[in-house]
């Protein structure tokens, strides 16, 4: 099938979302991330196609805290981050926070990357739509907004993703990979700024959520790391 060929070519290390989370669970279990002592926070795009990932996370670590906005960039601000950290289960020693950041991309039945054929629609649409709009704005400039409206999330997404590279990405695939790296960086910037490691162990996992037609979603790992009480980031391999 064309979409499977495209997946294997563009994302050779991708695995199903279930397989990915099983690997994550096996990886963090020796670090003390038992279900009863852990709290999950998830940053995915608001697109309805992304929501199944939250359900899968909930099966392993209970209902997660929602961090995400357009492009899966955390959009809750410092106040929201403080709220998330305050929900981490109390443990006799230290809390355990597991964070996921997943920009997403689609592959349509013809194997075209960056498009999805959505439920009850006859034509494919961009996935991620926000990232497609960002790519267009990088090439052609932002359109002026109607008075009374704002686009703060899109502007912030552009600024943070733009900081990842001096080169204009050629396509949505390249831009999505830059976005995943940007999401990972932003996670650690916020967690470091709040000194979260002083009270809890932290594991952050970032990747790309991939939607296939009539198939389970896949995850392409991008970055994974753990930080304990010493405040030192240690890379993990999923």
What positions do the PLM features span?
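Divalent-metal-activated hydrolytic enzyme cores
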Residues: 1-39, 45-47, 53, 62-63, ...
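Histidine-anchored nucleotide/phosphate-binding helix
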Residues: 56
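N-terminal, polar/Ser/Thr-rich
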Residues: 99-101
């Amino acid at each position: 099938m064309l979409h499977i060929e495209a997946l294997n070519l563009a994302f050779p290390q991708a695995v199903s979302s279930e397989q990915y989370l099983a690997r994550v669970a096996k990886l963090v279990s020796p670090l003390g991330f038992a279900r009863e002592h852990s709290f999950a926070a998830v940053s995915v795009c608001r697109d309805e196609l992304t929501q199944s990932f939250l359900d899968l996370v909930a099966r392993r670590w209970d209902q997660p805290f929602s961090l995400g906005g357009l492009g899966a960039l955390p959009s809750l601000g410092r106040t929201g981050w403080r709220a998330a950290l305050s929900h981490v289960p109390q443990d006799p020693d230290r809390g355990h926070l597991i964070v996921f950041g997943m920009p997403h991309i689609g592959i349509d039945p013809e194997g075209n990357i960056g498009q999805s054929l959505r439920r009850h629609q006859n034509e494919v649409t961009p996935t991620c739509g926000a990232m497609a709009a960002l790519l267009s704005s990088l090439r052609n400039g932002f359109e002026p907004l109607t008075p009374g409206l704002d686009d703060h999330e899109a502007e912030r997404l552009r600024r943070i993703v733009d900081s990842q590279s001096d080169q204009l990405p050629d396509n949505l695939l390249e831009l999505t990979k830059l976005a995943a790296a940007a999401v990972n960086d932003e996670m650690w910037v916020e967690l470091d700024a709040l000194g979260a490691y002083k009270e809890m162990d932290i594991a952050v996992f970032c990747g790309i959520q991939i939607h296939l037609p009539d198939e389970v979603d896949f995850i392409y790992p991008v970055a994974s790391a753990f930080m304990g009480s010493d405040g030192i980031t240690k890379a993990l391999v999923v």
